[in-house]
Amino acid sequence: MVSMPNPILDAAAGVTPHRRPVWFMRQAGRSLPEYREIREGVSMLDSCFRPDMLAEITLQPVRRHDVDAAILFSDIVVPLKAAGVRVEIVPGRGPVMDHPLLTRQDIENLPILDHDVHEVAEGIGIIREELNDAQTLIGFAGAPFTLASYLVEGGPSKNHEKTKSLMHQDPESWHLLMRRLVPTIVQFLRTQIDAGVQAMQLFDSWAGFLSERDYREFVLPYSMEILAQVGDVPRIHFGVGTGELLTAMSEAGSEVVGVDWRVPLDVAAQRMVSPKVLQGNLDPAILFAGEDVMRREIARICAEADRAIAAGHATGHIFNLGHGVLPNTDPDAITRAVEIIHTF
């Protein structure tokens, strides 16, 4: 039997796919009524450790929207929880640590994940059984800076002042923290790859709060180390608000660089150190603006990507949002956006 072409994997390899591939960050989530139903009475972290549930949630948007990839349903703090860190996800707030890292001793005592997360591996097996050859399963992990910020701040932060203070005031402790996070993140990604994910995204939610200088000194070496250890699948590197960091991020070693909605894709491509596959970058709010606006913005983004490819500044394009699907997005608007994207 001849296998079907896989648009995501083709694009990630710099091969022109048979249709423009698309998936959306947070496509599995609160925008879907079937997600809200299955999550009823189950905490976020519990749902990430139930193989049947995480598989079902991962597959829901693929069935509904005809996106070209499933993104593993998980959370960036799952590897911390699996390692033994006491963390919970508080509704309306996000990940909250029982004991933020306050001292050098706290950092030295931070547990390191040294085993497979078997619940996640089992869920991946279930997902792969349902996906066809044309559909890609993408795994992901939080990047070390973002995890470090949660650990140091104790939860989400508007300014990351404790994190930046540690970086500059005690760089030795900062680098120790990053060195302790790298093996945990790599182990979590290796669990996913060994279980069958076909690509992965390193997601740096908070990197946009850093200057390029700080990013290069305190973050980039560790993201590079992680990406170097998972090179057996295509790698996507994405951060929010990282337009000024794109040059540095493109040095980290991924084939694909995600771009948020603030920077046109053809401009972003020229900031890369070498041609990359671009991922992005529709503003998630445009999904609220009606079909005519969606079509216009999708056409613009596809044209920007195509210009970058034609100029030799990029090697491909995977359509995505510039961040995650917003919780109150109409799922029918997402389905229609996918249909429109597949016409370009």
From Swiss-Prot:
GO BP field: protoporphyrinogen IX biosynthetic process
Give GO terms: molecular function aspect only. uroporphyrinogen decarboxylase activity
Q: Does the keyword Cytoplasm apply?
A: yes
So which domain of life are we looking at? Answer: Bacteria
For substrate, which residues are the binding ones? 26-30, 75, 150, 205, 323
* Gene3D superfamilies in alphabetical order: 3.20.20.210
**The UniProt record lists the keyword Transferase:** no
Q: Which UniProt keywords apply?
A: Cytoplasm, Decarboxylase, Lyase, Porphyrin biosynthesis
Which InterPro entries does the record cross-reference, listed alphabetically? Answer: UROD/MetE-like_sf (IPR038071), Uroporphyrinogen_deCO2ase_HemE (IPR006361), Uroporphyrinogen_deCOase (IPR000257)
Localization, per the record, is: Cytoplasm
Catalytically driven reaction(s): uroporphyrinogen III + 4 H(+) = coproporphyrinogen III + 4 CO2
Q: Where is this site: Transition state stabilizer?
A: 75
Q: Name one GO cellular component term.
A: cytosol
UniProt pathway? Porphyrin-containing compound metabolism; protoporphyrin-IX biosynthesis; coproporphyrinogen-III from 5-aminolevulinate: step 4/4
| Positions of disulphide bridges | none
User: What is the role of this chain?
Assistant: Catalyzes the decarboxylation of four acetate groups of uroporphyrinogen-III to yield coproporphyrinogen-III.
Q: How does it assemble?
A: Homodimer.
Family designation = Belongs to the uroporphyrinogen decarboxylase family.
Q: What is this protein called?
A: Uroporphyrinogen decarboxylase
